[in-house]
């Protein structure tokens, strides 16, 4: 049985069980390696500029901060979730053909796309927020690109049957608000609006 487990580790990098232990030492080591390689903290270019003000001691509720910046700060200050790069690696390695094209209709940050590009695949991500798309394309690895649009329009940006995998993480209701854009479902006022 131990030999069988070791073979699974060799074949799959992490044992492919129903529940994956992300606190495991090997997982954490891989995650650190990816984090070092990707150098991505989930911010946008605008947030990076805003963080300079934050580091000088300006607080969230300071009246000197313009209203739109207060909202952005409130939404993004240490409350952002980043897609685990090891999950990206495993999903690509386990379920996609080598050199495959992966699409994401709710792309968010650069992690999924850059992991897939680094592993030899290509990636097309659709993201609503213009500043996030600009930031992502600046930090993009060869083979990864982001397009500013609503994820519902993904077929306007890829050819039919051109993708080998859809890997996405749509927003949850009432957990994180990414923007106040009209077509951003993360800012839905109630669950009925969100689900429809």
Question: Where do the language-model regions lie?
Answer:
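Class I S-adenosyl-L-methionine-dependent methyltransferase catalytic core
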Residues: 1-196
